[in-house]
Amino acid sequence: MSDHLIPSIPTPAAAPAAAPAVDDNQLIAERREKLKLMRAAQAEGKGVAFPNDFKPGHRAAALIEAHGAADAEALEAQAVAVSVAGRMMLKRVMGKASFATVQDATSRIQLYVTRDAIGEEAYAEFKRWDLGDIVGAEGTLMKTKTGELSVKVTKLRLLTKSLRPLPDKFHGMADQEQKYRQRYVDLITDETARVRFTARSKAVSALREFMVGHGFLEVETPMLHPIPGGANAKPFKTHHNALDQEMFLRIAPELYLKRLIVGGFERVFEINRSYRNEGISVRHNPEFTMMEFYAAYWNYRDLMDFTETLIRTIADKAVGTQQLTYQGKPVDLTQPFERLTIREAILKYTEAGTGVDDSAWLINALRKIGLSEEKDKLSQRSLASLQVMYFEETVEEKLWQPTFIMEHPTEISPLARANDERPEVTERFELYITGREFGNGFSELNDAEDQAARFNAQVAAKDSGDDEAMFYDHDFVRALEYGMPPTGGCGIGIDRLMMLLTDSPSIRDVILFPALRRES
């Protein structure tokens, strides 16, 4: 068995031709009738419709690993007693002997059920059970004539009656939105989904272990904020009845984490949800998981070094290699991550030439792309801001290999420290892989008076109609007035990192229950 957290995700076998459609409503009615009979039997003191006293002593994967290679004679001689439980996924009834396959959280294992072993009445009951029912079985291990490890059942119980039929075993859930909406069915029927989300959990655990191993303290900060802050984004609003005040779901934990740096914790991190009331796409979900971390006495170059090591380490622990494949194209984490300023990236990946330093040229180029004066206020923007817009429209998607993009304009980076030599830009970077932003970090602004002035500029922008501009956070400024050491901070999108590690095309594929329009 592989030591890596994310095993190779199996490729589903080609499906045979579809079987004739069966009316689900009819099947549900038949199953409800069976449950009705079970309840009636319970009322007469004959069993329990939903028993909860069966305790499986073994998992399918562990049994297969321990005994899968044993030969039939050895297993028979050992008479290994086992008890398993799971969902019945396959069933073949053949007179006095039948086979069923049950699936637990780890794998599947076959049951060999005979009338002689469990009794005529129990065998008759078993034949009435349906796929999807959850069963418990006791018996001994055996090998079939084809060499498949199986449980020769001596006791068999129905633990939960399934009222809804599972999708066709070969075709599964064909509708992608239905997979997202009914993730519980997707997990039952699609092994790749179970592998993917198990991998996500283990990779996040490895990430947490990495941070703690580097001296970071894990903390929890509020999800409900009296003032939204920490990022330029549109927040979700709610109302706190007891306090009788408007509150906001957090768009980022940044300002609270930096308060902790002021308080004397020199290295902190948080892995948690953030919320942004914005668009939904293959890269964006309004509720998403992010890790933010802050280290006193670090600057943005220290952060880039650390982030590079972090990404490589998690890839090693998760998939056992730093040479990945994403949607058929290689992603090489073994090479040093390229570091370019926004201007350098434009010159490298476009034919802008001297136009990169010409506001009029950039405005004209952006208009040709489809941006407008009315919506985007191009003529009101600085050269640095126009360069960012041109970068986002023409360069971003070309950054397939890991690349740090540096020196974002001060006007759009209200929490970042300005560059001492070029105060119009900041000591900030964004990490791009596969044409997508994976992280954002910078040397933190720790000048309280400068921060107050930046907040005032954000308030003016909000008054001019910028919904994503920040509010003025008086308490955060007050915290900075006590003095915050030089600090570096970074946020990494966990969902996008999981997309990369599991080769998933959409962010919805790595979020168990993504945001969807209400079902009609």
Swiss-Prot record:
Q: What is its main location?
A: cytoplasm
Which residues take part in binding Mg(2+) 2?
437
GO BP: any one term: lysyl-tRNA aminoacylation
Question: Where is this protein found?
Answer: Cytoplasm
One of its Pfam families is tRNA_anti-codon
The record's family statement is: Belongs to the class-II aminoacyl-tRNA synthetase family.
Q: What is this protein called?
A: Lysine--tRNA ligase
